[in-house]
Amino acid sequence: MPLVAHTRLPTFERLKQEGQTVLSEDYAFQQDIRELHIGFLNMMPDAALAATERQFLRLVNESNLIAQFHIHPFTLGTLPRGDKAQAHIAQYYDKFEDLQEQGLDALIITGANPAAPHLEDEPFWDGLCEVVAWAQENVTSTLCSCLASHALVQHLWGIRRRPLGFKRWGVYSHAVTMPEHPLVNDLNTRFDVPHSRFNQIDREPLEAVGVQVLVESTEAGVHMAVSPDLFRMVFMQGHPEYDTVSLLKEYRREVTRWFDGTRADYPPFPQNYLRPKAKAILNEYRLEQEKAKRLGKPLPDFPEKLLLPMLHNTWCDTAKVFYSNWIGKVYQLTNNDRRKPFMEGVNPDDPLGLRQQLGI
């Protein structure tokens, strides 16, 4: 299901340069195929805005090569933005009010950079709740990433996330816990997912309100769960959209914070991510940093080019299969009129018919 470059969003050109299939609008118009319209609520901070576009759009684009995708990025006006990001948004992003009028088949909601002790005090809170209230009535399925999952589980069911007291950071092994669900069809029974968070929502409070857990890790906890109707909302605590280098970039950011004094302790390595040789290189880099800091010298160059060939990606293939499953089900269930969430005869409280099948 290739993306259609229906706007001049620079991410389309970046993906084409990577070898991704991105159709021109003229070419797509010649194909007699009902395109799928997917909203993309990007709440990430300015520095990660474009990278987050690429990560999620890449997964959507690789999910299938038959249908067409029109991606509609939008954001919330309450999020603080610099001039450059604001100009990017003004030029390339849709307005939520327009999307409400035009309709969407599916919606992806990114995480965000936490700025307040409590989620309800975050600048995105009211706007996010408004978007989801509309989506629950008008969108076939909504996929929520990390902090968005935490916020919406709290908003919808009053479940507050649990502080871990440390950062769950690295790549962890997971297992499918509900193999009969079509969203995990053809996924490996065990696979890896990156995590990067200080908080967690556990299985027990989710199950108490009817949320079903699909994927879980003995070490990292719940990764994927679905709303009680089993499809209309999909929650993720992990980051299957991450690039191979994403955790390394986070590590680089943290060691820079230590060097400039905004972090007290030197950061640990992300778990299960770096090979021994990569750790040895980074330990040498730490010694260089410590010496430079003692002598009042500039931050030494980070050895990213040396490290890149040593990084493995053990999660991307599974992420592609999941996105294929999710988008395929949206395509099967959505109405031909994208202002309506389902085709005639689909039960909104059990769109997959799975609750009835399983006797839930």
UniProtKB/Swiss-Prot annotation:
Coiled coil: none
Subcellular location: Cytoplasm
Species: Thiothrix nivea (strain ATCC 35100 / DSM 5205 / JP2)
GO MF annotation, one: homoserine O-succinyltransferase activity
Role: Transfers a succinyl group from succinyl-CoA to L-homoserine, forming succinyl-L-homoserine. In vitro, can also use glutaryl-CoA as acyl donor.
Keyword ATP-binding part of the UniProt annotation: no
Gene: metAS
Site feature Important for acyl-CoA specificity, where: 113, 115, 147
Source organism, top-level taxon: Bacteria
Site annotation Important for substrate specificity: residues: 196
Catalytic activity, EC: 2.3.1.46
UniProt-recorded name of the protein: Homoserine O-succinyltransferase
